[in-house]
Structures are given as C-alpha cells and as structure tokens.
C-alpha cells in the first residue's frame, strides 16, 4: 500500500493518486463538541510540505465518496483511507462522543446511509491509547444506525509510537480482535531507528499477535524506502508516491513486493 501523506485538500486526492498512491492519509481536527470539523494538519508538519491546506470535513468526505464510487476513474486506484484523528484537542472523556459523531458523519456523507456510498476501506488512526473508546463509540453507533455491515470496511491504528504490548492490551479493552494496522514513524525532517517497526512486524508474524499490517511514515528518500521494504512492511506513507513506485520496480523488490489492488483485503495478514 502506497499511502499518500497529508492529503487534506480535495485537489490533492487527484494529485496523489496520479503519482501512484492507492491509499491516502487525511488529518481530521475536531471542534470543542467533538465534531469532526476540518481536514487540516497545521504547523509544524513535514519538511517541504504546505501545512495549511484544508477543507471542511464534510466537503472532503463527499469528494472522497465521489472518487471511490464505481464509475469514477479513481475508483479502482484509491481504496484505503487513513483518517489521522487529531484527538489531542479533546478531553479524554470526549473520545466516545468523537467516535459517535465521526460514525454519523461518515454514514451520511461517505457511505450515503448505506446506499451506494464510497467503497474505500477506512482506518481510524488514534494518537492516544487513552482514547480507545472512540473505537467503541464508532462501532456502537453504526450498529445502532442499522449498518453494522459497514464495520467490515473499518480498521484501526494507534499512532502514538507506544509499546506494542500496551497497544495490544488497549485493543483487548476495546474488544478489537482484527482489522489492525500498526504505524511507526517520525516526520521526514528527522531519522528514526527501525527497532519498533521490527517489533510490530514480529507481532504481525507471530501466532498470538493482533497486528495484521504494518506501515512506516514518512518515507521520502530512496534509501529509506529500500530500508523500509527490507523491514517487510505492508505499507509506506510518503509525500512522494512516485519514488515508492520507482523503488518497487527495482530488481531487488519487483519480485518480492507488488502494489496492492482493490481485490487485496487490508485486514488479512499476508503469509509468505
């Protein structure tokens, strides 16, 4: 999965897909009442990027629905969306409410109330383990609204670079048993060791681990891309998807990896 980083403006959806992304990451900021408000990152952000691009959340989600509905030219090119949920602005007790409001919003504006809505898989990426009730609030709301089937399209990620054991315990508290992606990384302005990514991959590949897929961010340089592929990740989050495509076509990688398609289930652990 080639995950376009910080796609917060409607025009950027096309831009990143055209460069080779089959997945995008979008920042979601919340208002004081825990409603998803903007797709916005703000400063500081990755080196070489405009941190201030934004849309109203509803407008972005409607455009995303159009792009990921059969008949659209992007439909079979873009099939995974990571919502990077900026919950640090919320009180801990608001996490469940944020999940409820996010679910209602996506149900209406993305899934079109279950009537021929967008088809992409969605990952809810949460920066704080304490906010695990966002997941339970989200799930319960879709069930209450009569659309539990949409949870087949939803996965989860804790993005705070916490200890993998603590992440696993938090999923147990939330009652999550699958659809788990694990991120690791740091802004492209800095370097980070592969210690934790290796631990995440080990959990993914172990018999009793909870992780299904592992991705690393933000990977922009060619050598870092090679190092990341050598760590056996499932996804690379990048500001330059065309560089990821280029490296995947190198002799060392083109027989070992392929770019995911719509037919690939992002919740299944890949077994060699």
Curated annotation (Swiss-Prot):
Binds 1 Mg(2+) ion per subunit. It is an enzyme of class 4 (lyase). Its EC number is 4.6.1.-. Keywords: Cytolysis, Dermonecrotic toxin, Disulfide bond, Hemolysis, Lipid degradation, Lipid metabolism, Lyase, Magnesium, Metal-binding, Secreted, Toxin. Signal peptide: none annotated. Mg(2+) binds at residues 25, 27, 84. The keyword Methyltransferase does not apply. It is found in: Secreted. It catalyses: an N-(acyl)-sphingosylphosphocholine = an N-(acyl)-sphingosyl-1,3-cyclic phosphate + choline; an N-(acyl)-sphingosylphosphoethanolamine = an N-(acyl)-sphingosyl-1,3-cyclic phosphate + ethanolamine; a 1-acyl-sn-glycero-3-phosphocholine = a 1-acyl-sn-glycero-2,3-cyclic phosphate + choline; a 1-acyl-sn-glycero-3-phosphoethanolamine = a 1-acyl-sn-glycero-2,3-cyclic phosphate + ethanolamine. GO terms for molecular function: lyase activity; metal ion binding; phosphoric diester hydrolase activity; toxin activity. Belongs to the arthropod phospholipase D family. Class II subfamily. This is Dermonecrotic toxin LvSicTox-alphaIC1biii.
